[in-house]
């Protein structure tokens, strides 16, 4: 939903007709976590999934809120909000990447995301992203170490940086502090 360069990749479900594929989604990025609304798309297991939800004594959510969200989407406001969010993210990420390019030195490199707000930075051989992230927390610098995103705890020399902030003096100072942390 948050792709701003090129078109969004198709979900795995588009590449096969397997009944084993289930697609989950939510409105978290537009509505926030308080609403807890999302969707599930599956080919042959939807009744079983709904039954399991009831068995686990979970509710299906607030019906008035669901109706309001359906009206919001039917009126095209969801798509309009997504377009606005994509433009804001593209601008913020581009500005953040320019700053990142200024503060990072070898052996660090990064890749520009095609959507979302995270930028992946690659450290040199032997760089321990988890150790640096832990040290950064003590200084108020938040990095997402690569092993957090790997089931095999790989990507030890990668970390993610959130570039979604409006780029004023404070975030720029944070990146400069991050650079100092990386060169220690």
Regions of interest found by a model, annotated:
Residues 17, 21-86:
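Conserved core segment of the aminotransferase class I/II
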Residues 126-132, 169-173:
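Short, conserved charged micro-motifs
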Residues 142:
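Residue-level detector of anion-binding/catalytic polar loops
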Residues 41, 120-122, 162-164:
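Short hydrophobic/aromatic beta-strand micro-patches
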Residues 86-97, 108-122:
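Conserved glycine-rich beta-strand-loop-beta hairpin in the small C-terminal domain of fold type I
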Residues 138, 154-184:
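PLP-dependent enzyme catalytic core of the Aspartate aminotransferase-like
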Residues 1-11:
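Conserved PLP phosphate-binding loop immediately N-terminal to the Schiff-base lysine helix
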